[in-house]
């Protein structure tokens, strides 16, 4: 009798696990289909945009995002160089994830936390940030991070580096309700993304880690220092 109950429990457990595996595979297939779609189609919005407009409309039901898609060749090369210099210096060389950078960021953040400092460093590549911004929420969990890694490898497998950077620059957050290079250039400088100069591009790139804060605090010591550093570094950056 006990052996029969054990076999019955194992069958039920096996059935549940198989059903969960099938659901997981169906979900990942759907995500892969979306990655393939965006390899050839420009998104009208993104997960991070939908999250932000919901947040803004909690206090202002009529709130709108500032977002205009522009093709890769209408974004000034200086912004491409500055963003890569700021966010992912090895963008053209890696396969989507830089494990050494993640380990170094983790060690740095642990040290900052031990000293009671709020400054943190991210280890995510441009492709990882794109996966998060385009498909996922801003919440933090091990499950979400795992899905981000899966999407990152999907994106790198399907898309060219140029397409990845084009998507990233067009959906990156650059302030409160400000998304994409074109909207950022017009919001901060009153010009198109095609007409940005090196100094303007470096400052926009320096804002990326905390764009909502720097939208309201546009001349902090850190932002000025980071802009100067990027101006020097961006000349040595390779772009796709």
UniProtKB/Swiss-Prot annotation:
It catalyses: [GlcNAc-(1->4)-Mur2Ac(oyl-L-Ala-gamma-D-Glu-L-Lys-D-Ala-D-Ala)](n)-di-trans,octa-cis-undecaprenyl diphosphate + beta-D-GlcNAc-(1->4)-Mur2Ac(oyl-L-Ala-gamma-D-Glu-L-Lys-D-Ala-D-Ala)-di-trans,octa-cis-undecaprenyl diphosphate = [GlcNAc-(1->4)-Mur2Ac(oyl-L-Ala-gamma-D-Glu-L-Lys-D-Ala-D-Ala)](n+1)-di-trans,octa-cis-undecaprenyl diphosphate + di-trans,octa-cis-undecaprenyl diphosphate + H(+). The keyword Transferase applies. Keywords: Cell inner membrane, Cell membrane, Cell shape, Cell wall biogenesis/degradation, Glycosyltransferase, Membrane, Peptidoglycan synthesis, Transferase, Transmembrane, Transmembrane helix. Gene3D superfamilies: Biosynthetic peptidoglycan transglycosylase-like (1.10.3810.10). One of its GO terms (biological process) is cell wall organization. Its EC number is 2.4.99.28. It is an enzyme of class 2 (transferase). GO terms for molecular function: pentosyltransferase activity; peptidoglycan glycosyltransferase activity. It is found in: Cell inner membrane. One of its GO terms (cellular component) is peptidoglycan-based cell wall. InterPro entries: Glyco_trans_51, Lysozyme-like_dom_sf, PBP_transglycosylase, Pep_trsgly. Pfam families: Transgly (PF00912). Its main location: membrane. It is a single-pass membrane protein. The chain crosses the membrane at residues 16-36. It comes from the Bacteria. Pathway: Cell wall biogenesis; peptidoglycan biosynthesis. Peptidoglycan polymerase that catalyzes glycan chain elongation from lipid-linked precursors. HAMAP family: PGT_MtgA. Belongs to the glycosyltransferase 51 family. This is Biosynthetic peptidoglycan transglycosylase. It comes from Bordetella avium (strain 197N).
């Amino acid at each position: 009798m006990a052996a029969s109950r054990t076999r019955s429990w194992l069958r039920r457990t096996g059935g549940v696990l198989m059903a969960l595996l099938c659901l997981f595979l169906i979900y990942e297939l759907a995500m892969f289909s979306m990655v393939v779609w965006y390899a050839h189609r420009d998104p009208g919005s993104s997960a991070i945009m939908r999250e932000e407009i919901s947040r803004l409309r909690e206090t202002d039901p009529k709130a709108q995002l500032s977002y205009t898609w522009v093709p890769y060749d209408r974004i000034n090369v200086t912004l491409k160089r500055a963003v890569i210099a700021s966010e992912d210096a090895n963008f053209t060389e890696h396969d989507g994830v830089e494990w050494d950078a993640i380990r170094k960021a983790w060690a740095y953040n642990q040290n900052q936390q031990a000293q009671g400092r709020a400054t943190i460093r991210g280890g995510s590549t441009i492709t990882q940030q794109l996966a998060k911004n385009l498909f996922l929420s801003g919440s933090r969990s091990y499950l979400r991070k795992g899905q981000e890694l899966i999407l990152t490898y999907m994106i790198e497998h399907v898309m060219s580096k140029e397409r990845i950077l084009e998507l990233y620059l067009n959906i990156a957050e650059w302030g409160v309700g400000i998304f994409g290079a074109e909207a950022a250039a017009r919001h901060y400088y009153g010009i198109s993304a095609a007409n940005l100069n090196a100094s303007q591009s470096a400052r926009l790139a320096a804002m990326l880690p905390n764009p909502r804060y720097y939208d309201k605090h546009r001349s902090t010591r850190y932002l000025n220092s980071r802009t100067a550093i990027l101006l020097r570094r961006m000349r040595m950056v390779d772009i796709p």
